[in-house]
From Swiss-Prot:
It comes from Sterkiella nova (Ciliate). SUPFAM superfamilies: Nucleic acid-binding proteins. The keyword DNA-binding applies. The gene is MAC-41A. GO terms for biological process: telomere capping. The keyword Heme does not apply. May function as protective capping of the single-stranded telomeric overhang. May also participate in telomere length regulation during DNA replication. Binds specifically to the T4G4-containing extension on the 3'strand and protects this region of the telomere from nuclease digestion and chemical modification. This is Telomere-binding protein subunit beta. Residues 242-262, 376-385 have a biased composition (Basic residues). Keywords: Chromosome, DNA-binding, Nucleus, Telomere. Residues 295-304, 312-326, 365-375 have a biased composition (Low complexity). Residues 263-280 have a biased composition (Basic and acidic residues). The sequence of MAC-41A is shown. MAC-41S differs in only one position.
């Protein structure tokens, strides 16, 4: 493929059809005949809403009574409400433009809905489709919503040109002169249509009126009323809620949730405070930890220090030592060593001279034995003489 050539852009069939309808002022007869071909669709959902997709967007088809009867006559063993994940071919169809309440109909926008009316269709049970993307609501597409807004704006311009003429236009100069005086607020407002409130509804298109069946009626026809009630219990009557009532309920629900979360937060905070109080109660302070003997320092059983009411032993002063270092043992000089010996002998009761010898205390052991041998030798020498 050359640089200048580009791959053909794929487009949604539903988006193209519905856009053509709005661009032709809602007149289906003006839609190109090349687009009016059978539609092969994938059924995204069959109850409580019947939704079909072209792989890009989903829309809601509306079945006529004739289409449902024909389907049941040709396919008696197949239910329309059981076509989820199946493929259907819509042979005969048309498009209509309706004015609806978008707060209740989710397949609409700005109170306008383009409806796919099904006159004849059949299932294609042998074919299976695997969508490569998740389809979204066509009426939530930004580009398509812009198309609907343009349609509304064009209708509003047409209504203004039809009702407002030069004779009934307000003289702006008179309105400006009366600005400083008391007057009506709507003195400079020109009413362009008979719409009530701020919602414009004076459209010139011909609204469709083809009769169709609700999917709930088709469900009852195929499975009975009891099955419908059971299905309604499972789905809880799914509806699109909106408007002031819906907002009020949502706000009340949110406020209730905040109160419940606040109560939960208070109870959890109280539990945390109780746990902290217990820990503080049973944790000894720094002072008590100093006096409390550790396992390795616990006195032996039977000693007087372990008796109740005994005096606490006053710790003695530490022995003199050298400078502390993390790299090696204590560095002790000779003077410090002499001081250590003096301290040690004072503790035992003796005295040490500057040379390090013990004064005023007779040594025991080998020294006494040597002195005894020397005295015997001297006696023998004297006897020989």
């Amino acid at each position: 493929m050359s640089k200048g050539a580009s791959a053909p852009q794929q487009q949604s069939a539903f988006k193209q059809l519905y856009t053509e309808l709005f661009n032709n002022e809602g007149d289906f007869s003006k839609v190109s005949s090349n687009l009016k071909k059978p539609l092969k669709c994938y059924v995204k959902e069959s109850y409580p809403h019947f939704l079909v997709t072209d792989g890009y967007f989903f829309v809601a088809p509306y079945f006529t009574k004739e289409a449902v009867n024909e389907f049941h006559a040709k396919f008696p063993n197949v239910n329309i409400v059981d076509l989820t994940d199946k493929v259907i071919v819509i042979n005969n169809w048309s498009l209509e433009l309706r004015r609806v309440n978008s707060a209740e109909v989710f397949t609409s926008y700005a109170n306008l809905e383009a409806r796919l009316i099904v006159h004849s269709f059949k299932p294609n049970l042998q074919e299976r489709l695997n969508p490569t993307r998740y389809p979204v609501n066509l009426f939530r597409d930004d580009e398509f919503k812009t198309t609907i807004q343009h349609f509304r704006h064009t209708a509003l311009q047409a209504a203004i040109n039809k009702t407002v003429k030069g004779d009934n236009l307000v003289d702006i100069s008179k309105v400006a002169d009366a600005a400083g005086k008391k007057g009506k607020v709507d003195a400079g407002i020109v009413k362009a249509s008979a719409s009530k409130g701020d919602e414009f509804s004076d459209f010139s298109f011909k609204e469709g009126n083809t009769a169709t069946l609700k999917i709930a009626d088709i469900f009852v026809q195929e499975k009975g009323k009891d099955a419908l009630n059971k299905a309604a219990d499972h789905t809880d009557g799914a509806k699109v809620k909106g408007g002031a009532k819906g907002k009020g309920k949502a706000a009340a629900k949110a406020a209730k949730g905040k109160k419940l979360s606040a109560k939960k937060g208070d109870s959890s905070a109280a539990d945390v405070r109780k746990s902290v109080d217990k820990i503080v109660k049973y944790t000894p302070s720094k002072g008590s930890r100093k006096d409390t003997p550790q396992k390795s320092q616990a006195p032996a059983a039977g000693k007087s220090s372990a008796k109740k009411g005994g005096k606490k032993a006053v710790p003695s002063a530490p022995s003199p030592s050298g400078k502390k270092s993390a790299l090696t043992t204590d560095k002790m000089t000779m003077a410090q060593f002499v001081k250590y010996l003096d301290w040690h002998e004072k503790k035992k009761g003796g005295k040490v001279s500057s040379g390090g010898k013990v004064l005023g205390k007779r040594s025991a052991g080998k020294a006494s034995a040597t002195s005894g041998k020397a005295s015997k030798a001297s006696k023998k020498t004297a006897a020989k003489k």
